[in-house]
Amino acid sequence: MTIAELFAPNQTLAGHLLALLDNQATDTAHDLAHLLRVWQNVRKISAVEGGNLTVLTAATLLHDCVHVPKDSPDRANASRLAATAAKAALTKLNRPEQEIAAVRHAIEAHSFSANLSPKTLEARILQDADRLDALGHIGIARCFAVSGALGRPLYDPLDPQADARDLDDTNFALDHFSTKLLQLAGQFQTETGRILARERHAVLMQFYEGFLNEVTLS
């Protein structure tokens, strides 16, 4: 089976879009494996909630097509830039205007940094599917992979839980759990997404509490 065939019945569209992504440099948290995990989440959610799989195929494959580093001052614009690039790519493929508009909105609204409300079912599904990948075991791995790539320490050895300092996930990987990851489960858009998120949130909490138990100085 090819990668494009994983997106059946939209494997032809997927093949065209995957070809556009072949030469794009990206970090390990937003690579092809991430796209496939998000697609798996999309399928799980849409199997219950519904949604247009053609729109979801394109939105999944293109939602990170413009890479803006996590430490960039332009990070909040990443989803808008990706949505603009997605529109251009789909226009070249002569996709219907209504489909392009739906894909563009889903991409714009998926990002935590963009802080936009998803207005369509497809946008809600993509946002949930992408955020699920920030939770659970894979979310833990992605958090530390990104922090390591940015040269950030794992935690503050004198105050790992930030009891006497401000949380700062630009300096400590563990702080990202409190500033973002542990808040995500309450922000899901679909009932199916919320169910899946609760399971992965429990994994995060178990890891976080165990980590603190091992590193907190007595």
What are these regions (language model features)?
Residues 2-5, 24-49, 62, 115-218:
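Divalent metal-dependent phosphate-bond-processing catalytic cores, especially two-metal-ion Mg2+/Mn2+ enzymes
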Residues 4-20:
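Short alpha-helical hairpin
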Residues 12, 16, 57-60, 102, ...:
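Generic alpha-helical secondary structure signal
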Residues 38, 78-91:
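An active-site-proximal "capping" alpha-helix that borders the catalytic cofactor pocket
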Residues 53-72, 78, 82, 103-111:
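His-Asp-centered metal-binding catalytic motifs of divalent-metal-dependent phosphohydrolases/nucleases
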Residues 69-74, 185-189:
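A short secondary-structure junction motif
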Residues 89-124:
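Hydrophobic, well-structured mid-protein blocks that either form specific transmembrane helices
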